[in-house]
């Protein structure tokens, strides 16, 4: 598979994929099957509608070679959706789309899993999913002794711990679930007491975290 780009001459047609990347033409050859600029722009329009976070620059980088398995997988799903569900697909784009899906699936032998997100506040603050103290939490008395207590990892696996203070359920919708340990009741009604016997019990051979 070869990706061809050009910034020389007149632009083939007015489309953001070309204009935003300062290109006049863009094409791919997959096993001697030519995928034109128009076909790639058509695919981009559908892919960006399914994944609004991707822009023209990211899509061009994707065409040259995906960075991770998640990005590659979402692109292949778009190609498959086009072939199986897109009733407006021009017939001349069908074979190039088939060949692209066949070529890009081979990238799975090269790409690596996406690294864990560093945007999770709990992961940054907690070492090995252990409770950690915080100076304040909105909705709790300013003089309360407060801890953030992770109760599951990102895969949903419960975290074992031995608690000696009252726990309150956080209204947070974050994937890394946690509760708040406080020696004083909250001032806000949105926090309610949390009880989970499976998380409070220590399994044989484990060393639960102690507050």
Curated annotation (Swiss-Prot):
Principal subcellular localisation of the protein:
host cell
> What Gene3D superfamilies does the entry give?
Tenuivirus movement protein (1.20.1440.190)
Q: Does the keyword RNA-binding apply?
A: yes
Annotated Gene Ontology cellular components are: host cell cytoplasm
Top-level taxon: Viruses
Location in the cell reads: Host cytoplasm
Q: Which UniProt keywords apply?
A: Host cytoplasm, Host-virus interaction, Inhibition of host innate immune response by virus, RNA-binding, Suppressor of RNA silencing, Viral immunoevasion
**MF-aspect GO terms:** RNA binding
Keyword hit for Manganese: no
| GO biological-process terms attached to the record | symbiont-mediated suppression of host innate immune response
Q: Subunit structure of this entry?
A: Homodimer.
State what this protein does.
Acts as a suppressor of RNA-mediated gene silencing, also known as post-transcriptional gene silencing (PTGS), presumably through the binding of dsRNA.
Q: According to its UniProt record, which protein family does this protein belong to? A: Belongs to the tenuiviruses p3 protein family.
Please report the name of this protein according to its UniProt entry: Suppressor of RNA silencing p3
Native species of this protein? Answer: Rice stripe virus (isolate M)
């Amino acid at each position: 598979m070869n990706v061809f780009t050009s910034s020389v001459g007149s632009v083939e047609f007015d489309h953001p994929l070309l204009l935003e990347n300062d290109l006049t033409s863009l094409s791919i050859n997959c096993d001697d099957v030519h995928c034109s600029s128009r076909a790639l722009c058509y695919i981009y329009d559908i892919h960006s509608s399914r994944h609004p976070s991707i822009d023209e620059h990211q899509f061009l980088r994707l065409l040259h070679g995906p960075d991770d398995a998640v990005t590659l997988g979402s692109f292949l799903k778009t190609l498959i959706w086009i072939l199986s569900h897109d009733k407006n697909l021009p017939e001349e784009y069908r074979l190039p789309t088939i060949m692209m899906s066949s070529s890009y699936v081979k990238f799975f032998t090269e790409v690596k899993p996406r690294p864990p997100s560093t945007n999770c506040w709990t992961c940054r603050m907690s070492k090995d999913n252990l409770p950690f103290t915080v100076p304040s939490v909105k909705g709790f008395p300013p003089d309360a002794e407060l801890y953030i207590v992770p109760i599951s990892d990102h895969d949903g696996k419960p975290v074992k711990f031995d608690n000696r203070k009252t726990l309150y359920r956080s209204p947070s919708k974050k994937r890394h679930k946690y509760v708040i340990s406080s020696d004083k009741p909250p001032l806000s009604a949105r926090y309610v007491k949390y009880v989970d016997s499976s998380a409070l019990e220590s399994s044989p051979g484990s060393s639960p975290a102690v507050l």
